[in-house]
Amino acid sequence: MNVTSPKDGNHSFSKKNRFNTNKPRFHKLNEQAQSINLPEDRDSIVSSNTTSIMTDDAFDYNEGIASRTKNINSDSDRSNDTIKQNNYNKRETGYNPFYNGSGINQRYTQFRKREFEPTLAENKAEEYISDEDNVKIDEDNIENELQFTPKIKEASILRSSLLGQRNVLNTRNPKSKESHIKVKPIINNKSSSQRKSSAALRKQLGKPLPLPYLNSPNSDSTPTLQRKEEVFTDEVLQKKRELIESKWHRLLFHDKKMVEKKLESLREYERKRMPPRGTDVSSSEQDNSFKISTPTKSYVSLEQKPLPNLSAMNNFNDVTDNKEKEETNNNILKFQAQRDPLQILQSEIEMHTKKLDTIIELLKDDTDSKEKRKVVTNDNAAPEQMVNKGWRKNVMMIYKKSGNIMKKYREYFLWTICILILLYCNIYVYYRF
């Protein structure tokens, strides 16, 4: 490498004399050469393969650089001014392809052609593609095609659309209506969330009111007044009282007949089983069982307002007699003129409470008589009869216990049956429709 000073441009150093010079002068010359701001030579820039593309022009350019370096080494005695002039001349002539615009465009077009028009070697490589590569290519094509495919609709929407198409076809072809099966429209298109919300609303609102409460207030006022007027009339009271008394007598006679039948059956059974000594005692007690005792207590407090002219209700026989019944009715009618309609109703309620007291006491007397009979039979019965009677008692006790259990759990049993029926109906409706 030749180093020249700016003062003496024509003077040049040889290789032998360069090393013999003084060191300080050599350093000064190097510092002066480095201080000079020379323009960078773009031809000396080396680029990586990633950014540059080798072409024929670049090959020629490399050959020119090699020849130029040889000439520089051979002509070591030349000055730097001549070298710089040559470099500037080369740049002006357009020798460097990186500074020539037409060369860049040519390289760009060639590069694009190589991308879109593969060579023979690439075509041969494509011909020998393996099966796995073909499968991957097919999968990529399927994924690209699936982007444009329509989404699957819900079952309910598809059914409604199909039914609409069938209806349109049936309207166009009326002859084919008879041949095709009639399809029922889908009613329950609600989702589970909508059903739950409707059920929650029904629970909050409760059961629906009957129709009379939904009418207008003007329409409700007239019937209520009419009902009140009907309640406070004497004719209506008489009719209702007659109906109640007729029902009362029917119940009494029916119960009396049933009780008599049961007692007769018990008598016959005991006569067969009992010895002759105990027949008189048992018959006397059984006859006394039919006697009716007077009511001692009532379940409604009647001490504040005692009813007049109700002495005929003291005995059960007086209630059954028609003559005394007519007398009581007449007395009640006479007393109604002196009292308000509310007091009349209260008096009737008290009469019915007394009647209920009589029935309860009759039933108690029957139970007492049965217990006395059992005591007598136990005293006079033989050991074999005692065994039979003990077995009978056990059976009766089991029967009574079972009856009590059924009475207790009857309501629960009925509720379970109702719930099972409702579940069956819901399942049937859900799968049928």
Swiss-Prot record:
Q: Looking at the record's lineage, which domain of life comes first?
A: Eukaryota
GO BP field: cell division; karyogamy involved in conjugation with cellular fusion; spindle pole body duplication
In-chain residues carrying the UniProt-annotated modification Phosphothreonine = T233
Give each disulfide bond as a residue pair: none
Q: Does the keyword Cell cycle apply?
A: yes
Q: Name one GO cellular component term.
A: endoplasmic reticulum
Q: Where in the cell is it found?
A: Cytoplasm, Cytoskeleton, Microtubule organizing center, Spindle pole body
Keyword Cell division set for record: yes
- Residues annotated as region Disordered? 1-38, 69-101, 207-227
Keywords, in A-Z order: Cell cycle, Cell division, Cytoplasm, Cytoskeleton, Microtubule, Mitosis, Phosphoprotein
Primary role: KAR1 is required for function of both intranuclear and extranuclear microtubules. KAR1 helps localize CDC31 to the spindle pole body (SPB), CDC31 then initiates SPB duplication via interaction with a downstream effector.
Quaternary organization: Interacts with SPC72.
Q: What is this protein called?
A: Cell division control protein KAR1
Q: Which organism is it from?
A: Saccharomyces cerevisiae (strain ATCC 204508 / S288c)
Query: Which gene specifies this protein's sequence?
Result: KAR1
